[in-house]
Amino acid sequence: MMASRPDCPLACPSQADLDSFRRAGVDVLAMATPAAMQVATGRIAHDGLFEPDGSGQRWFAFREEDADDMVFWQRQTGRLTSCSGRVFALGQEIINETATYSFDCALNIFADPMDWLNARRDGIVVMPNRWPAAFDRLRDCPRIAIAESLLPTYRRNMTPGRMPELYITPERRTAA
């Protein structure tokens, strides 16, 4: 996995896990593609990152190849974390894909990984501690469709982190 963190033992979801997701309306392909959902046991460490722990809680794991990271979701609590802290959003590789915006489609931003899975991973779930990076990561998206519950968070964070200091240069005027 990531060089900065210890390897995390991953397993396939149990049949009970799969049945639970199916009852919640999640399509089997959404659990398997583009990369299969896996299961890890661990906890959130003091630095806010996932730490493998055999006596910890069960977390569903999603590999984020473009960030060389892995997102962990604890379904019972709804908590999200990652292995190295490099990932911006669950499913973030879709942000820069042309097909995301073709035929007047929009980038979907979901409030919860279950909604994301029910939509067959057609969008992203922004990591809770990564919303301040939203402006830099999403400003070039032509269209965004966002969960209503996220609208205040989106509006608060879709501003540049800082603006340059501005100086006004007086124009020279000539006599007529």
What does each of the following model-derived ranges do?
Residues 1-58, 173-176:
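TOPRIM metal-binding catalytic domain and adjacent DNA-binding surface shared by DnaG-type primases
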Residues 13-16, 130, 146-149:
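Short coil/turn linker and secondary-structure boundary residues
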Residues 21, 60-62, 144-146:
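Generic structural hydrophobic/aromatic packing signal, biased to beta-strands
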